[in-house]
A protein has these predicted regions:
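Active-site microenvironments in enzyme catalytic cores
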Residues: 1-8, 12, 17-21, 36-135
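Conserved "landmark" site that anchors the functional core of diverse proteins
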Residues: 25-29, 79
């Protein structure tokens, strides 16, 4: 099952189900309108979304439309927080070397995680706007 958030003029977008081959999609508004709703009530909503996904993938969804990735927002445009893990040792070694710092021995056995508060996230095809140049 593929879920996405489509631009609809709101800050949170509209939840859609996308076909396996990324050719078509269907609004999930009869089930949930926002991705956060799905995460908050996964056990109840995911089976319904899975059923819609199967219907879409079998070409039987009545109101399917052509999927356009440029219309996608970030899956969760406004998340409560985010977490990031540095799991790629090669990347960490290169970054540390560029800064002239050693990789701590504990990094090879203890995962490095950090979190931050969220503002908003950009979609995969959205422009990054330099706020200093906006008048």
């Amino acid at each position: 099952m593929k879920l996405a958030t489509y631009k609809d003029g709101s800050r949170d977008g509209q939840l859609i189900v996308v076909s396996r081959d990324l050719s078509s999609a269907h609004y999930a508004s009869g089930i949930a309108t926002r991705m956060q709703q799905v995460l908050d009530d996964w056990n109840f909503l995911s089976p319904q979304l899975e059923e819609l996904s199967q219907t879409l993938n079998h070409g039987k969804a009545r109101h399917a439309f052509a999927f356009d990735a440029r219309m996608c927002m970030a899956p969760l445009p406004r998340a409560y927080q985010w977490a990031d893990g540095s799991a790629f040792i090669n990347h960490v070694e290169l970054v540390r070397k560029a800064r002239g710092a050693e990789v701590p021995e504990s990094f090879y056995t203890d995962p490095l995680m950090y979190q931050g508060g969220s503002d908003d996230f950009l979609g995969p095809c959205d422009d990054i706007v330099d706020r200093k140049s906006v008048v």
